[in-house]
Amino acid sequence: MASTSEEGRMYDKCVIGYWVPERKRQKFNWTDFENICESEGFRLKMIDMNLSFETQGPLHVFLHKLTDMQSHAESGDKNAEDIVSRLQEYIAKHPDLIIIDPLDNIRNLSNRYKSYEFIQEGIRFKDIFTPNFVEIKSRNVHEIASTLKKRGIKYPFVCKPLLAYGSSNAHKMMIIFNERDLKDCQLPCVAQDFINHNAILYKLFVVGDRFHVVERPSFKNFYEEDCNSLSTIFFNSHDISKSCSRSKWSILSEEDIPLTVKPNYQIFETIVKNIREIFGLILVGIDVVIENHTGKYAIIDVNVFPGYDGYPNFFEHLIDSIKKLLVERENFRQISKSCTLKKCQSDDLDSGFESDEKKKYSTK
């Protein structure tokens, strides 16, 4: 294990390269991160994605929010394709570079249907689940109704864009209450069971092996009679769950107020541990609701490098995570070096033994 003085020397030469959209940097007050990096002995360097990465190196850590760039590349945008391709080449040439977070791992969250499949396959706890879901591929109302029925999706359900990022529409969603409004589905999309959760959304903001839970407003409970009387609710998921949101759809009836379930933070810990294992991410946000009556925990979405609103000491925890990754990398190097040395010594001994044996037999 590296000593404190060794760690200090390690960080003095460490360059954290980053590319984060300006809007996100302003929201985070990026100057605070620059100051923390400087005080911890790191050098923070903004990377120009249009220039050669080699000429901007050497880099020890690359921190990024390239979800939109990746999405555009996958959609055929030539400039985005070139940037992502050059970055992947640079990463391949520098296997010791720490990426927060790996591009392939992030890609697993680009498609909501596939990400829900990953969660469904990876979560094996009776009190934790992802709501029933299905991809809608047809605009025909009767075909949509048939697909929902086969999958056991009941009204109301949430209709979400298939792509989780890369478009301004990624957070434009709707709650559909009946078959007559299936025409409102915007393809490509995923239908997900709506879970009654007493208008409380829990955002689990994860930074490495730490996390913080923020309670946000959400949708009130909907019942069978609502399916007859209500039309589609169109909403932006960012707006409905803002801390300052005052939507009429978040106001509980008096009889529903006692249904609120007090959260169990040990279950949140289990969710965080499992989602990190499933997706292999350092910076991730997990949206969780607690189902009324059953008290089960529903994972309704997972997001890459979220906003972290309400997360105290985010930059300090990020730097701590980077330090831990650097120490783990250094320990791995030392172990690899030790194993290589032992193998060389073993090979030398074997070679000597073989040589002596050959001499012995050659004299007979």
Pin down the residues of each PLM region.
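A short, well-structured beta->alpha microelement
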Residues: 37-57, 140
